[in-house]
C-alpha cells in the first residue's frame, strides 16, 4: 500500500496546489472527479476483484468527463499545452490497449484451465499455470512503463497570463496525472489478484478437487470480464480525448475526422 500512497502524494500535491477555485463548474467538476479517483487508490489494504473493477469504472467516468469538457473548447484555444497532453494521452491509450490484449489472453487461459479440469488433464493444468506467469510479467511491465511516465505526466504546466485557460490546462493536466497514477495501481492490482488466484495453484494436485477449483476459476473469469468491460470504456474515452485535443490543435479542419473516428470505435 506504500506505493499507492506515494502515487496519491504526487498527484494530490499537484491538485491541492491549484491557485484558486475554478469558476467554471465543468473544470471544478473535473477536479472533484480527479480527487475521487485518487481517493480510490488509497482505499483497500489488499487488491480485490471488486476494488479493481471500481477503479476502472472511476477512471472511465473521469476520462468521459474530460472528453465532454474538451469537446466544448473553442477551436481558437491556444495549443501551448494541448500538444504535450496529446502525447501523454497516446502513451496512456497504448498502455490500456496492451492491457486489454493481456486480459484477452488471460480469458483464454482461464477457458483452457477449465477445460483441463473437466477432462482431468494434469498436463494442461500445469501448462496453464506456467502461462499465467506470462500474464503476470505483462501486467508488471505495463505498470513499470507508466510508473516511469508518471513523473513527466505530473510535472507542472507552463504558466500563462490567461487565467481561465490556465485553470483549464491545470485541470486537464491533473486529470492526466491521476489517470496515469490510477492505471499503474490497476495494472499492479490485477497482477497481485492474479498471483493469489486459482491459476497460481493450478498443479496436478488440484485435479483432485475439480469442483472447488472450477468455482475459483469462474470467480476469476467474472473478475476479468468485469474489468474488461471497464477497460473498453477507458480505451474509448482515451481515444476520444486525443481526438478532441486534435480538434483544439487543428480547428475545423480536424472536426470531420473526429466525428468519423468516434463513430467507428
Locations of the language-model features?
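Long, contiguous alpha-helical bundle segments
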Residues: 1-265
